[in-house]
């Protein structure tokens, strides 16, 4: 998987068309209303639903107010530069409520739990789990077979573009409510204890804890048993 360069992301945001998409329920004498091709209209003679850009739909509502009796607008963003990732082709388990922006890479058999937030340019390796309410900032990278605990934050780096992003190498376990600051690399097989604030690189196969996080020991068999990654949680339905 290739991490996006910060300047690529900045250019994408700069050049993208800023959108305010809405869903509008309408009621009235709709046979008298003409809808442009740029608006998706699922209507009958008396009611229907519209999908499209707010500026266009507002014009329709204003120009046809004598035919439209009532309407309700659903809107969750304004001048948005980055769409949500199309999840339909992703070979991973993604639970309801996860917010995943476009240009995020998700490896096969990864797991994204409820209310996790994944920003543009982030990379999640095969078989890694991002737990509930965890946040992966822009360009944060998680390797294979990792677990990022509930409420953990991997800080994002888009600006300044020269800054180094968070990199979590393979087989890492990050506990709940951990904060990993910009530029930190968490080495392969390491364990970060719950609640730690990681300000410096974590050596491979070590356990760190505290605020700021410090190495407290090397990985041993007891630690491996307590932080085992269960592949059963990452299995998908067999392809038909």
Curated annotation (Swiss-Prot):
Keywords: Acyltransferase, Amino-acid biosynthesis, Diaminopimelate biosynthesis, Lysine biosynthesis, Repeat, Transferase. Pathway: Amino-acid biosynthesis; L-lysine biosynthesis via DAP pathway; LL-2,6-diaminopimelate from (S)-tetrahydrodipicolinate (acetylase route): step 1/3. It catalyses: (S)-2,3,4,5-tetrahydrodipicolinate + acetyl-CoA + H2O = L-2-acetamido-6-oxoheptanedioate + CoA. It is an enzyme of class 2 (transferase). Disulfide bonds: none annotated. GO terms for molecular function: tetrahydrodipicolinate N-acetyltransferase activity. CDD domains: LbH_THP_succinylT. Its EC number is 2.3.1.89. GO terms for biological process: diaminopimelate biosynthetic process; lysine biosynthetic process via diaminopimelate. It holds the Pfam family Hexapep. Belongs to the transferase hexapeptide repeat family. DapH subfamily. HAMAP family: DapH. Catalyzes the transfer of an acetyl group from acetyl-CoA to tetrahydrodipicolinate. This is 2,3,4,5-tetrahydropyridine-2,6-dicarboxylate N-acetyltransferase. It comes from Bacillus cereus (strain ATCC 14579 / DSM 31 / CCUG 7414 / JCM 2152 / NBRC 15305 / NCIMB 9373 / NCTC 2599 / NRRL B-3711). The gene is dapH.
